[in-house]
């Protein structure tokens, strides 16, 4: 596949894609902004604790590969980064808003069911129903320039099969044995997480506003 990302590169690109949609007033992101986004505890699996130097290394690599570009000058006191991974002027990868939302959520959280994806991607795109989620996943799985996602075998105790992105290579389709006591309703859990994400982003916006008022 043309697009091959390491786990850390996937996290960085996923964060930039997410913030471009959910907090456009804070986008593009500085290095510190990318570090905060990579390490946030909501809507991330696994939760990471990356240092600034680790993130800077990933940013430099992605700029060299033309997946990101730097933005400086015109009032920016620090270098900022914006994604060119998809939907850029000269890039080949073109995705719909629904496709961006699903790909971003998969980059940030790994394999998930359609129900989990619908709830967790709601901040980026409001799917009308589960049929739209599933049809978008099928489109991503069958694109001529892809496939970009794959459907995994259904795990024990789960009602839905999970999907995973293919931007980091092929996925080993080996469902783990799941404790039935942990087989909670994925939709409900995802909705709770979506609310936590919304609260965290509102707090981030409030902190940013207070910081500007204090300048």
UniProtKB/Swiss-Prot annotation:
It comes from the Bacteria. The keyword Transcription does not apply. It holds the Pfam family DUF480. Keywords: Acetylation. The modification N6-acetyllysine is found at residue 80. Belongs to the UPF0502 family. NCBIfam families: PRK11239.1. This is UPF0502 protein YceH. It comes from Escherichia coli O139:H28 (strain E24377A / ETEC). The lineage of its organism: Bacteria, Pseudomonadati, Pseudomonadota, Gammaproteobacteria, Enterobacterales.
